[in-house]
Amino acid sequence: MDGKLRPMTAVYITSGKKILLLYRVGSRVVEPSFCGVGGHFEKDELCDARACVLREMREEIGLGEEDLCDMKMRYVTLRLKNGEIRQNYYFFAELLPGVQITKPCCEGCLEWADMDSVLERKMPHTAWYMLDHYLREGRYTDLLYGGVTTGKGVVFTPMQEF
């Protein structure tokens, strides 16, 4: 292990009982699959995951924080893959009533998925386990969770400031 890091962000936007997914194609990191809207940090964002996800959201779907309510970072995960540590910062937010996504997404196809069946879709390993945890537990709390990916899933724990 030589210390290579790959920090990434994603936001999962909800609207009622639906969640916005991006079927991403052409990624340098994962094969075509469903994920949240987001991407890699720019150098000036390395200490600001929120700035990264807001930039990615504006670029990919044309939305800003003013179009959402209750946007919060809810998960930070780590995974060792291909000799690098992948750091994922996952945000969740609710789309404000009346706001629509009108910008075509150049990263793939957008889909509003039912939360009851979202886990049936092909997703990156860590994203699937994060969404599974969110749907079972995370959406009912205001906690920030840390997760470490293993061969059998992701081990989550609430993060606490002390």
Positions of the model-derived regions?
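N-terminal strand-loop-strand
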Residues: 1-36, 65-66
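Intrinsic-disorder/low-complexity loop/linker signature
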Residues: 3, 82-83, 152
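Short beta-strand element of the conserved SAM-dependent methyltransferase core
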Residues: 11-13, 91-94, 147
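Conserved S-adenosyl-L-methionine
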Residues: 72-74
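Short, hydrophobic/amphipathic alpha-helical patches that form generic packing surfaces
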Residues: 128-136
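Charged phosphate-binding loop/patch that engages nucleotide di/tri-phosphates or the phosphate backbone
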Residues: 136-162
